[in-house]
Amino acid sequence: MSIFVTGDIHASYDIAKISESCFDTTGLTKDDYVIVCGDFGLVWNNTASEQYWLRWLDARPFTTLFVDGNHEGFALLNSLPETTWNGGRVHQVANSVFHLQRGQMFDIDGYRIFTMGGAASSQYDREHRVLGETWFTEEVPNEQERATAIETLDQAGWNCDLVITHCAPTSAAKGISKHTDRLEIHPMDEYTDWLQTIQDRLTYTHWFCGHYHIDAQIQENTTALYNRIAMLKEPESANDAKGSDASTLPYQLLAEAAKEPKHEITDYATDLDDQDSLE
């Protein structure tokens, strides 16, 4: 079994990076996992396009896992069937697509993985989107979800292997700013301050996030992902890996796609009757 981690896919817009044209899936099975660090974007209104791309993911030779970002259809997402999977609560989105809920701890392939989705949309988004339709107050975790997270971490002794979030803790701001000016759009806020309190208490090996549209190590043990895919090392070696040197990181970045991933996949066709193949 293998675990891969990547950044936002924004429905079909950035999904090409996990297509066979950009990501070698040779030998993978449904016991291998691709984790998306938020802004999954394929659960909004149950449209034909969303159904097509969920079927496309089901046809891939891996299981897709994701934490939520700020660009999700929370009304539909939170209405999906819930179940316990690998020790934590999930929404089952498709046969092999699962939403890893907030404040959960999962045991996956020898890793203990804490998940805490959510982030605040930009002021521009809030002004130009429609509340309850294209942006939701649920994008930022509420008090109950944060209490659940604390309870989960208490039970785990404030110790885990990996943390998967959408936005980063506030202390990562300096590292993010070295690579992008997106903090002007998505500044650190009350929720990233709360994530900071988690980071300050938690013993962990590595923290992955999305949101900032960069591929960079933004703190000693924190990596932001967007187009790149990180393949986790075996748990035994990963747990000994701490630091900024590539040889000591608990993951290996897969080779960068030769072309812009968006150009490597045929976009959704409006006539679904012609979509006999999910390749």
What are these regions (language model features)?
Residues 9-13, 129-145, 186, 190, ...:
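Catalytic cores of nucleotide-sugar-dependent glycosyltransferases that transfer UDP/GDP/TDP-activated
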Residues 63-67, 83-86, 91, 95, ...:
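Conserved beta-sheet core of the metallophosphoesterase superfamily
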Residues 6, 12-107, 184, 188-195, ...:
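Core catalytic region of metal-dependent phosphoesterases/phosphodiesterases
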Residues 95, 109-186:
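Active-site-proximal loop/helix segment associated with metal-binding centers of metalloenzymes
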Residues 10-11, 41-42, 71-73, 118-122, ...:
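Short, solvent-exposed loop/turn segments at secondary-structure junctions
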Residues 258-279:
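Long, low-complexity, intrinsically disordered segments
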Residues 1-4, 104-115, 162, 219-223:
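Beta-strand-turn-beta hairpins that frame and shape the catalytic cleft
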